[in-house]
Structure formats: structure tokens, C-alpha cells
UniProtKB/Swiss-Prot annotation:
The gene is TFIIB1. Belongs to the TFIIB family. It is found in: Nucleus. This is Transcription initiation factor IIB-1. GO terms for cellular component: nucleus. A zinc finger (TFIIB-type) spans 2-34. Associates with TFIID-IIA (DA complex) to form TFIID-IIA-IIB (DAB-complex) which is then recognized by polymerase II. Interacts with TBP2. Interacts with ATHB-7 and ATHB-12. The keyword Ribonucleoprotein does not apply. Keywords: Metal-binding, Nucleus, Repeat, Transcription, Transcription regulation, Zinc, Zinc-finger. Disruption phenotype: Embryonic lethality and aborted seed when homozygous. GO terms for molecular function: TBP-class protein binding; zinc ion binding. Zn(2+) binds at C6, C9, C26, C29. Sequence repeats lie at residues 115-192, 216-290. Its main location: nucleus.
Length: 312
């Protein structure tokens, strides 16, 4: 319940909303402060015969500000028994033509929602991806291109903007057949296209190795103790000029931390969990090896433990 000023009570009082009547009442004196309000959220109850093919909902779904026809609408149909009434059929064609502009967006949003669900992404990322695609559509820049690659690229960019990055390889798994190269090209195209709009540039943000750490560790079922050590180690690794991608650094830090524990993970396991090739992990290990004593947390591994690690 929220508060509002009641003209009868002459003070701020709690409000009671009667959804069935559409009235907002003062909780103390019962004065109707607002009447006949429309609830635009989805209908929860149905009243039609369940065996009927008609839609049992009296009100449509929640409004979507990205759609032109998202407000409450009226359906224009032919009169009962009419086979070709000129007026009603003309109005019907006009209505269908008016709603066509949203059909492509609705399909795009459905596909993005499905991809987002398969990746386990939060709603804010899905909504941001929808916004990116809507901006492309407004500029008529999505036509003639691989739509699945565009949807996937919008999700990739949205993840980065929301500081929940995913690798292109992870995105590729749910991209309905779009390849890494196609998604990469689509991503570059979106950044270039939307960046041309004044004040509307696409800021991808900066990816850090730590952004992937918890998810990769979870994929490997690492202990909380090891996860904490890996997160601390990857933060310390940023102090050195290690010219490797954040994903590669995350993978090699996990390899180092697990080799210092009783629950060792093979390069194959880490490669499968992170999507980084075994050869890349080996080469990254060579770059981090000289800094092991400064990267590995002292509470997790002693100097003697570090000396027992294999040399590259």
C-alpha cells in the first residue's frame, strides 16, 4: 500500500486498491480517491469456457514501450453473417496494416527472450538487448542480415553493458546455428551503426578476467576456498602487463589454483568449462609463471607449494 493525501481526513493516509472495481480508497474514511482505473498488467483469472477456442482473457498482456501498438486496442471484425461488408473489411485491412510494423519486433523479442532464458540471463539484460534491436529496426539497419546473428550479438553487447559478460562461444551455443564469425561481424556492425547516432554510442565497457571467474569456477564445481583464492589471484594478475585476453587469464588462474589444491583439474576439464583451448592455457601459463609468488594468495599456498608446480 502507498500513501496519499485524503481531502476528508486532511492528512496523508494509506491507500487501499480495489482491483475488481478499479477504485482507490482511503484506508481510514473510505473516500474514493480515484475510480475506474485500468489495470494494464496481465490477466490472472479466466472466465470463459475452457473447452472454447476463444481467448478467455478479458484484457491483453502487459504493455511494451518498445512496440508502437502496445497500448490497449480494439479489434475490428466483420459483423456476424457478413461475407464481404466493404466498410468492415476495409477497416480490418487498415488495422492489420497498422499492426504489421510490430510483428517483426514481436518475433525478434520472442527469439531474444528464448536465447536469454537458455543462457540463464536476468531480465535487465534481455530488455537491454531488445532496446538495441529496436534501435537497429528504427534505422532500418536490420534488413537483409542474419537475424539470429543480430539477436545473439544484441545479447552479447547487453551482457557487457550490464557487467555480466558472456563469451561469444557461449553465445554461439544458443544462436540457432549462427557461427562465431557471423555473431562477431554482427556485433561490429551494431556498434558501428548505433555509434553513428549523436549521443547514442554503444559503450561496451571493459571486460576483466574476474567477470568470468565465479561462473567458470562453478562449472568446475570448485570449493568456496578455491574460488576465493582464484578471485584474489585474478585481481592481483591485473597489476602485471600480461598480454592475454581476460578469458585466457581467468582460465590459467583457475589452472594454477586447482594445481595447488587436492582437487586438481586437468587442462581438458578447464578448457571444457571455460571454452579456452588447452594450447592457449599452456601459453598463458608461461606468461604468468614468473609472477606466481605475487599472484597466488599467501594464505592459500606457501612458497614450497609454488616450487612444486611444473615449470612451463
Amino acid at each position: 500500500m502507498s500513501d496519499a493525501y485524503c481531502t476528508d481526513c486532511k492528512k496523508e493516509t494509506e491507500l487501499v486498491v480495489d482491483h475488481s472495481a478499479g477504485d482507490t480508497l482511503c484506508s481510514e474514511c473510505g473516500l474514493v480517491l480515484e475510480s475506474h482505473s485500468i489495470d494494464e498488467t496481465s490477466e490472472w483469472r479466466t472466465f470463459a469456457n475452457e473447452s472454447s477456442n476463444s481467448d478467455p482473457n478479458r484484457v491483453g498482456g502487459p504493455t511494451n514501450p518498445l512496440l508502437a501498438d502496445s497500448a490497449l486496442t480494439t479489434v475490428i471484425a466483420k459483423p456476424n453473417g457478413s461475407s464481404g461488408d466493404f466498410l468492415s473489411s476495409s477497416l480490418g485491412r487498415w488495422q492489420n496494416r497498422n499492426s504489421n510494423s510490430d510483428r517483426g519486433l514481436i518475433q525478434a523479442f520472442k527469439t531474444i527472450a528464448t536465447m536469454s532464458e537458455r543462457l540463464g540471463l536476468v531480465a535487465t539484460i534481455k530488455d537491454r538487448a531488445n532496446e538495441l534491436y529496436k534501435r537497429l529496426e528504427d534505422q532500418k539497419s536490420s534488413r537483409g542480415r542474419n537475424q539470429d546473428a543480430l539477436y545473439a550479438a544484441c545479447l552479447y553487447i547487453a551482457c557487457r553493458q550490464e557487467d555480466k559478460p558472456r563469451t561469444i562461444k557461449e553465445i554461439c551455443v544458443i544462436a540457432n546455428g549462427a557461427t562465431k564469425k557471423e555473431i562477431g561481424r554482427a556485433k561490429d556492425y551494431i556498434v558501428k551503426t548505433l555509434g553513428l547516432e549523436p549521443g547514442q554510442s554503444v559503450d561496451l565497457g571493459t571486460i576483466h578476467a574476474g567477470d568470468f571467474m565465479r561462473r567458470f569456477c562453478s562449472n568446475l564445481a570448485m570449493s568456496n576456498h578455491a574460488v576465493k583464492a582464484a578471485q584474489e589471484a585474478v585481481q592481483k594478475s591485473e597489476e602485471f602487463d600480461i598480454r592475454r585476453s581476460p578469458i585466457s587469464i581467468a582460465a590459467v588462474v583457475i589452472y594454477i589454483i586447482t594445481q595447488l589444491s587436492d582437487d586438481k583439474k586437468t587442462l581438458k576439464d578447464i578448457s571444457h568449462a571455460t571454452g579456452v583451448a588447452e594450447g592457449t592455457i599452456r601459453n598463458s601459463y608461461k606468461d604468468l609463471y614468473p609472477h606466481l609468488s605475487k599472484i597466488a594468495p599467501s594464505w592459500y599456498a606457501k612458497e614450497e607449494d609454488l616450487k612444486n608446480l611444473s615449470s612451463p
